[in-house]
């Protein structure tokens, strides 16, 4: 939504760690004293975050403690006791974000509300709990969104955090109208500094992209804030993660191979640097699978326009950040010490070709269109549909083992009358079977089939198309797109022409249904085609 320091709904990221390692226990980087003793004991970031939460809960109210909440595992408390809730800022299937005001101070903040009924299993609950722990752990860092409080009542979990009124990172680039390598270096320096902080505190973000960096205000000197820690995890040095999470253009090759660590964040920032300098992603294709294939090849184009005009220092840094071998890739600290990125470094203060700025405008505009469409699709997924998938699993799992094989899945889906092709079922099994043992369990099945059977189905794409096609003419016109984006709070008059131009393959000045579907499926913004544990907070924009 680009207006508050929050990514919206809750993300799912389960079974990330290599067997035998701690899923949410980072390296012991801090100390704590026991009963005032001078003796220091190791304290992990997760433990410190939990302690911070407990302290916040203990000091937030003088009233008698309420019943313990099953999500945050501390006394439940009404968020409206402290904050007044204002206008809606964004909505999706799994939650809604409102403007809120602190009653005592008048401070304007953002309140993200997650409906507890949407937390379908223990993994979902653990993910919300971990997101809160990580945000508490990172609290106080100047360029990371500040979580002011986490509240739980009978029906919801509420996360109150800073309001970022300055828009997205792309907004700053585009608004200035001119752009230099030195400006790109300054942006990258801020971003890498944030990631260096996260890594030094034992946190991998796992979803770094321009949309997750917001400006605190509209001022020229407004600080950049990293947001959306819904996919983030605590890590220990040497720990290996296996979940495929992130956004398609920015996913590192080792993530696709299900064996990665903090180096994956550096790859994502390298992709961002490429986009800052060229205006397009380095790995571009007509479908997610083709994008992933290109990523795995790791061949980057530094010869086409505008690269001949880009400095050798910038190209050197791009190569070193997009090294396909994570062991040879630069660390955040090494990036910050590269000659091109330093404050008085080698990045020239010469305007980049206008084509770069125009490409950035078009790239951002299409993201906004897709955001609006995904929001409509999210509304198509009812709680009843999800419950139906749970019942489907029970019927397929005849021996009540809690797992099903590929053949059981094929037979069970056929008996259920669900129209999956063999290829879809095989993709489903491959994506969901994280440990490669040939079976999927209940939670994997539900999260995977929600995507395969709901998110990308024709009827939901058509529903989204109809939302934009206000007069039911079979076409989305410039005026209809303007109206729809205004309704979604994503409107920018300067971007509408770029959106139409990019999607309108037959150049008739409007978007028909086939062009709309092609646009939605071309280089989709999230890794759902391969990731059964879909990024739920992408649907709350």
Swiss-Prot record:
Coiled coil: none annotated. SMART domains: EFh, S_TKc. Ca(2+) 1 binds at residues 397, 399, 401, 403, 408. Its main location: membrane. The active site is at residue 207. GO terms for cellular component: cytoplasm; membrane; nucleus. Activated by calcium. Autophosphorylation may play an important role in the regulation of the kinase activity. It is found in: Membrane. Ca(2+) 4 binds at residues 504, 506, 508, 510, 515. Ca(2+) 3 binds at residues 469, 471, 473, 475, 480. May play a role in signal transduction pathways that involve calcium as a second messenger. This is Calcium-dependent protein kinase 25. It comes from Oryza sativa subsp. japonica (Rice). The lineage of its organism: Eukaryota, Viridiplantae, Streptophyta, Embryophyta, Tracheophyta. The gene is CPK25.
């Amino acid at each position: 939504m680009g207006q508050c320091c929050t990514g919206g709904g809750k993300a799912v990221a389960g079974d990330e760690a290599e067997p035998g390692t701690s899923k949410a226990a980072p390296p012991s980087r801090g100390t704590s004293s026991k009963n005032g003793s001078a003796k220091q004991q190791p304290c992990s970031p997760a433990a410190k975050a939990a302690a911070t939460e407990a302290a916040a809960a203990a000091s937030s109210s003088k009233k008698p403690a309420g019943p313990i909440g099953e999500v945050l595992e501390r006394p439940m408390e009404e968020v409206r006791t402290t904050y007044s809730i204002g206008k809606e800022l964004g909505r999706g299937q799994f939650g809604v974000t409102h403007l809120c005001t602190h009653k005592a101070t008048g401070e304007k903040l953002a309140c993200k509300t997650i409906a507890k009924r949407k937390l379908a299993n223990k993994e979902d609950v653990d993910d919300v709990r971990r997101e809160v722990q990580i945000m508490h752990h990172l609290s106080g860092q100047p360029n990371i969104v500040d979580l002011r409080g986490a509240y739980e009542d009978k029906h919801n979990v509420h996360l109150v955090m800073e309001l970022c009124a300055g828009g997205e990172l792309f907004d700053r680039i585009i608004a200035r109208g001119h752009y230099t390598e030195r400006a790109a270096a300054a942006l990258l320096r801020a971003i890498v500094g944030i990631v260096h902080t996260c890594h030094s505190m034992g946190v991998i973000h796992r979803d770094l992209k321009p949309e997750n960096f917001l400006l605190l205000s509209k001022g020229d000197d407004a600080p950049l804030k990293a947001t959306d820690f819904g996919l983030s995890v605590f890590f220990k040095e040497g720990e290996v993660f296996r979940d495929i999470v992130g956004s398609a253009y920015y996913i590192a090759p080792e993530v696709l191979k299900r064996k990665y660590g903090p180096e994956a964040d550096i790859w994502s920032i390298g992709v961002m640097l490429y986009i800052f300098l060229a205006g397009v992603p380095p790995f571009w294709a007509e479908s997610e699978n083709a994008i992933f294939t290109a990523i795995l090849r790791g061949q980057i184009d530094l010869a086409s326009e505008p690269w001949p005009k880009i400095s050798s220092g910038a190209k050197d840094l791009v190569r070193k950040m997009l090294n396909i071998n994570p062991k040879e890739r630069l660390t955040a600290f090494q990036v910050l010490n590269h000659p091109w990125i330093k404050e008085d470094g080698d990045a020239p203060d010469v305007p980049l070709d206008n084509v770069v700025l125009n490409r950035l405008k078009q790239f951002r505009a299409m993201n906004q269109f897709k955001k609006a469409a995904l929001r409509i699709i999210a509304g198509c997924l009812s709680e009843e549909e999800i419950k139906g998938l749970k019942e489907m699993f029970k019927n397929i799992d005849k021996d009540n083992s809690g797992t099903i094989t590929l053949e059981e899945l094929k037979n069970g889906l056929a008996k259920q009358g669900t129209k999956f092709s063999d290829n879809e079922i095989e993709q489903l099994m491959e994506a969901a079977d994280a440990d490669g043992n040939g079976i999927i369990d209940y939670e994997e099945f539900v999260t995977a089939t929600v995507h395969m059977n709901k998110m990308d189905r024709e009827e939901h794409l058509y529903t989204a198309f109809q939302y934009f096609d206000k007069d039911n003419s079979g076409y989305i016109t410039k005026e209809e797109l303007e109206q729809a984006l205004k309704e979604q709070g994503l409107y920018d008059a300067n971007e509408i022409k770029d959106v139409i131009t990019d999607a309108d393959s037959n150049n008739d000045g409007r978007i028909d249904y086939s062009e709309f579907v092609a646009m939605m499926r071309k280089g989709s913004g999230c890794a759902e085609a391969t990731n059964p544990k879909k990024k739920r907070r992408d649907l709350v924009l």
